[in-house]
Amino acid sequence: MNLLDPFMKMTEEQDKCMSGAPSPTMSDDSAGSPCPSGSGSDTENTRPQENTFPKGDQELKKETEDEKFPVCIREAVSQVLKGYDWTLVPMPVRVNGSSKNKPHVKRPMNAFMVWAQAARRKLADQYPHLHNAELSKTLGKLWRLLNEGEKRPFVEEAERLRVQHKKDHPDYKYQPRRRKSVKNGQTEQEDGAEQTHISPNAIFKALQADSPHSSSSMSEVHSPGEHSGQSQGPPTPPTTPKTDIQPGKPDLKREGRPLQENGRQPPHIDFRDVDIGELSSEVISTIETFDVNEFDQYLPPNGHPGVGSTQASYTGSYGISSTPSATTGAGPAWMSKQQQQQPQQHSLSTLNSEQSQSQQRTHIKTEQLSPSHYSDQQQQHSPQQLNYSSFNLQHYSSSYPTITRAQYDYTEHQGSSTYYSHASGQNSGLYSTFSYMNPSQRPLYTPIADTTGVPSIPQTHSPQHWEQPVYTQLTRP
């Protein structure tokens, strides 16, 4: 900065002159110790040291100022300052306001500033290496410890300065600069609170941000320490703390509806980021059968061929069977997309999906095995259909609960149709039961499209295409 150049020259001349002892303190005073509220600028005086004190300060202080430095140093300072063109120094200008061409008029110092300036000057002389911020903190602590009697001279001096300032600048009006940065920080924190439920601070700020919508006054909600505002808030505030949302997450999924249905709710949970692994098997085993149809809006529409063609014909039989997941200890048997994929094969494959589905529901809804459920396909294969449904009830219900995890880890055999054809009797029902394994096994299952050799299987022994149910992964949309 240009202002420091004269002081650098000044210190050089002091070294030439005589005593180097006062020079560090003087250069520290003039350059190092910022006195923010000193009245007046360096342009008005040839000695900048005097300007850190108020104009009409005690004469005693000015005398001590003059006595502080030897005559040689004072002459060197005045010589340097004379040789410098002070009109070249840019004046500090406040951008907002019409006073761009006028020099900035500082506020009159209050009592604490009078004390801090005088004490800072004294301490900076004695301890030139004190950090200015630490010095300010210490001065503030000391000021709070002073009693009224000790503060009185500073209060009187501040009052005198205020009166003098009013005389000098009768039309002075204090116009503080608006702190845009702080407000931006607050709004950023509020935005962050609406997107990620991180800190209670951010949650309370978000509650404050939503307070115009609530009927009660949220003015009490200033800090997370005051919980009075929490009880007075809206009955279902859009941003709830994370501790509330985690038990709530399975509930929202249990109802099968997105979070965004609650009116003006900000998008807290992006379903693309939600792993179904969060729903543990215990949670899903407690879920009653519900319509998985609403989940299909989160599944990729074009992910598998033939999904949309017969979607309507299977909606009645979707569901999660809680009995198999309870007996096997494995994850739920999700049926949502298995049936939708089979129409891409020929028409008998739909029979198998109905068959496997009906045997899957034997413990839960036996009314779904009635012929009325299969009305869509009954025109084509009505004799076989009734045969299969009764066959499922008597054939699979005995062996169904005894399945263990080891029985369906069969992914290494997926390619060979010979394995399936000789095991066609009972295993067909066992394997088609678990169309959706628990989350840890999800990546193992790939679509089985190998239909070779299947028509040779006898119809009465097992349904055609029994390896046809495609084991799908519920991928994120």
Swiss-Prot record:
Modification(s) after translation: Sumoylated. Lys-365 is the major site of sumoylation, although sumoylation at Lys-61 also occurs. Sumoylation plays a key role in regulating formation of the neural crest and otic placode.
Glycyl lysine isopeptide (Lys-Gly) (interchain with G-Cter in SUMO) crosslink, residue number(s): K61, K365
Annotated Polar residues bias: 308-328, 346-361, 453-477
Region of interest called Transactivation domain (TAC), as start-end residue ranges on this chain: 361-477
Motif (9aaTAD 3): 428-436
Record's function text: Transcription factor that plays a key role in chondrocytes differentiation and skeletal development. Specifically binds the 5'-ACAAAG-3' DNA motif present in enhancers and super-enhancers and promotes expression of genes important for chondrogenesis, including COL2A1. Plays a central role in successive steps of chondrocyte differentiation. Absolutely required for precartilaginous condensation, the first step in chondrogenesis during which skeletal progenitors differentiate into prechondrocytes.
Protein name listed in UniProt: Transcription factor Sox-9-A
Protein source organism: Xenopus laevis
